Amino acid sequence: MIDKSLLTGSTTMLLLKLLEEKDMYGYMMIEELAKKSDDTFSLKAGTLYPLLHAMEEKGFVTSYEASSNGRQRKYYSITKKGKGHLKEKKQEWKQYSSAVNKVLKGGTAFAY
């Protein structure tokens, strides 16, 4: 099991990455994140929705109502600002993980 503190800060990046692929509603994001991470990332609705609201306030995502299988759902879509933020965070993550791997392996950082 992965220490939850390791996930802090990366959740926004992961959600933006999902939304870069397609617009999604909350439960769909929870399911997709779990699936793509082999159940390593399991978000609860009580964690997800405050993050989505904060991302919307920052202009990283927008939301809209649409019908899915006869049910009204709130979909989220990444904005241009959100794509820029995602690009920055991905670069920061590469630098961070490379530095961690360098220390753990006792040698030079490896390229991805």
List each language-model region with its residue ranges.
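N-terminal helix-turn-helix DNA-binding core of bacterial DNA-binding proteins
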Residues: I2-T47
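Conserved anionic group-binding/transfer micro-motifs
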Residues: M29, L48, G82, W93
